[in-house]
Amino acid sequence: MKIITRGEAMRIHRQHPASRLFPFCTGKYRWQGSTEAYAGREVQDIPGVLAVFAERRKDSFGPYVRLMSVTLN
């Protein structure tokens, strides 16, 4: 499965009313300048996960990326 843009993920989320947004993993990844830098990268294929997208977050150590998923579980 590939990481897609947030807009594409929200479109999938709206198409499936039973879906919800959930963190894909617990890790934090270094910020690379834009979320498009992460689009197209391969991630593990997990049953029930419809899409994975990168989301920018910020804490006391600075900006980072968190992978979020659109899931049916």
Go through each PLM region and give its residues.
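Short loop/edge segments at beta-strand edges and connector loops
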Residues: T5
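Acidic, low-complexity, intrinsically disordered interaction modules
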Residues: Q15-N73
